[in-house]
């Protein structure tokens, strides 16, 4: 019998097309006979999806270098499926350049010609890579598997546990009838919180402008008037995008004059007053590699440590149980690089340092004394607590003094992140990447307290990781300083507060006297996930019938994320998992698994896609009842 089965993948961004590539890789082994159709549903182009779509400003950059971006598995990935090797973004761009730029959009040719493995690319270059990756995955499909693209929005999925699923599309009268549905939904679009709604109503009442959290590339910034005072809450990557769009994006230009970057305004820029909890921008992305030996996989927060924590009766607390091990591992990676690449800046034999470091607890007097003894220069010591709050305890006489301090701070950061003499920071960066995977294991065990998961892991840890390891390219911080010198940007300070009163928005910082008033307020960050406030019609339809629920923790708090099993199977209101529905993405119980990755890092997103693709292929080929590991 010619067995015909089908899968719908809702969301054709990097995650969705990564799944198609894994289906292509494993189908010859697991689905040798019969016919499989994969329906790919997304109003945006397959490969890039919404976030990486080509239709966005060329001024928006990636914050990764081309040599650090791949969609392909390599020998580091512990996956059952075959590795189908392929180029990084850098290798692909070089290949395209060598072939005369075939199939490349006309307006990208110049960037292709100038691209290097370590020059930060535009998001549109990544968009072109993702488009090519999708076509490459299609070409790799065996003859009994085909992909049908639907440029449409999925608005509902219906169907019981025992039978086919109907995927309803906004533009289609008839549903797609399939055996399994995968929701690769990316970040959740959400309605404003009550606090944000109140600010929006206040703005409307007083003829002010309020921009709630959102993807910067999706926001209409034209409401921000030339010369208007605009408060910006948030100093991360969303701010950097905003900064580019309202300056260069409005006709201003940067120019190097005698070794200093100068900004020439167009006169159309608003005046940005920026603040945040830390009061400083994210650290520049490092411009170097490790110079010495890598410390290797986690040593203190290793698999055995994770098993010990999750096997206990008592629930796991982040600061008491996990952070001392995480911090010690990251510090170990840092000092291993310092010793192996820059040993002349250390004062104890490595063997002695290693022995005493391993024996001491994080935060103990012994460890502090050891570091002071072994590492004479304070700037060579790793202090994550000080890194996290660089302005803690400081006060400034006025805005001018704060500005002077921040300029010195940012210049020092740019210099440090460009100088291989400080490659120990790259050791710490890799240590953080490894810690990410270990923390995910503890989260998956369900043993964390509610507060540890929501306040410490989902909020503080993700934030600290982004701030230290996932900041903007250094040239963006050069631009920030140039804009400050040109009077387009001002700094509010740390622990920024905002009030809505007197028909204006007012802001300030406990570290700086005085207040700023403005006629616009922009929240420069992504919205927090919330199933309860989701606006995506598919999420809303499933939620309202109890077929998709917000993750709820043992202590009664909710995380805003979509509840799934570790397999990705979608959990319903009665606690059962739907055997034919899977949800993947950053806003599910599984949490972080980036859709593309640095090469040679055994990326969790690649492992997840491989596992899901193989589960689907096995299940559909077996021909019996369909159950996705519920």
Enumerate the predicted regions with their spans.
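Flavin (primarily FAD) cofactor-binding/catalytic cores of flavoenzymes
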Residues: 1-56, 109-620, 624, 629-630
């Amino acid at each position: 019998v010619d067995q015909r089965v089908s899968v719908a993948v809702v969301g054709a961004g990097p995650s969705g097309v990564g799944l198609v590539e894994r289906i292509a890789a494993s189908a010859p082994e697991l689905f040798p006979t019969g016919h499989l159709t994969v329906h790919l549903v997304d109003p945006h182009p397959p490969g890039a999806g919404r976030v990486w779509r080509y239709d966005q400003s060329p001024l928006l950059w990636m914050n990764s270098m081309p040599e650090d971006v791949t969609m392909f598995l390599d020998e580091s990935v512990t996956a059952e499926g075959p590795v189908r090797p392929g180029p990084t973004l850098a290798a692909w761009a070089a290949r395209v350049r060598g072939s005369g730029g075939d199939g490349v959009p006309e307006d990208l040719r110049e960037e292709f010609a100038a691209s290097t493995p370590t020059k930060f690319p535009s998001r549109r270059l990544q968009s072109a890579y993702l488009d090519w990756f999708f076509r490459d995955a299609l070409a790799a499909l065996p003859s009994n598997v085909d992909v049908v693209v639907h440029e449409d929005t999925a608005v509902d999925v219906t169907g019981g546990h025992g039978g086919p699923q109907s995927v309803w599309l906004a533009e289609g009268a008839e549903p797609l009838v399939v055996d399994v549905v995968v929701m690769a939904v990316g970040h959740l679009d959400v309605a404003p919180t009550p606090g944000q709604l109140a600010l929006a109503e206040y703005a409307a009442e007083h003829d002010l402008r309020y921009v709630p959290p959102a993807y910067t590339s999706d926001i209409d910034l034209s409401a921000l008037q030339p010369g208007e005072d605009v408060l910006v809450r948030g100093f991360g990557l969303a701010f950097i995008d905003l900064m580019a769009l309202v300056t260069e994006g409005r006709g201003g230009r940067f120019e190097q004059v005698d070794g200093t970057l100068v900004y020439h305004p167009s006169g159309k820029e608003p005046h940005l007053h920026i603040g945040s909890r830390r009061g400083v921008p994210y650290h520049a992305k490092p411009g170097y590699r490790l110079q010495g030996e890598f410390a290797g996989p986690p040593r203190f927060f290793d698999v055995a440590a994770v098993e010990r924590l999750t096997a206990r009766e008592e629930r796991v607390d982040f600061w008491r149980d996990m952070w001392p091990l995480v911090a010690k591992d990251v510090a170990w990676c840092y000092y291993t690089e310092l010793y192996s690449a820059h040993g002349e800046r250390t004062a104890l034999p490595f063997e002695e340092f290693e022995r005493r470091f391993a024996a001491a607890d994080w935060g103990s007097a012994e460890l502090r004394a050891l570091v002071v003894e072994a590492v004479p220069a304070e700037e060579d010591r790793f202090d994550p607590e000080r890194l996290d709050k660089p302005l803690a305890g400081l006060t400034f006489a006025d805005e001018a003094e704060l500005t002077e301090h921040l300029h010195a701070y940012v210049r020092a950061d740019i210099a440090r992140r460009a100088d291989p003499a400080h490659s120990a920071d790259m050791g710490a960066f890799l240590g953080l990447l490894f810690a990410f995977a270990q923390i995910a294991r503890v989260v998956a065990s369900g043993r964390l307290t509610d507060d540890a998961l929501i306040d410490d892991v989902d909020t503080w840890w993700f934030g600290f990781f982004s701030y230290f390891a996932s900041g903007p390219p250094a040239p963006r911080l050069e631009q920030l300083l140039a804009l400050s010198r040109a009077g387009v940007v001002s700094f509010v300070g740390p622990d920024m507060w905002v009030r809505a009163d007197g028909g204006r928005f007012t802001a300030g910082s406990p570290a700086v006297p005085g207040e700023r008033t403005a006629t616009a307020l922009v929240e420069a960050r992504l919205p927090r996930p919330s199933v309860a406030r989701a606006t995506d019609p598919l999420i809303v339809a499933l939620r309202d019938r109890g077929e998709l629920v917000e993750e709820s923790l043992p202590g009664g708090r909710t995380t805003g994320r979509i509840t799934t099993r570790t397999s990705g199977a979608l959990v319903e209101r009665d606690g059962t998992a739907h055997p034919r529905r899977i949800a993947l993405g950053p806003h599910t119980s599984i949490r972080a698994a980036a859709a593309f990755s640095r090469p040679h890092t055994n990326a969790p997103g690649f492992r997840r896609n491989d596992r899901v693709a193989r589960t689907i292929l096995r299940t559909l080929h077996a021909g019996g009842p369909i159950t996705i590991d519920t």
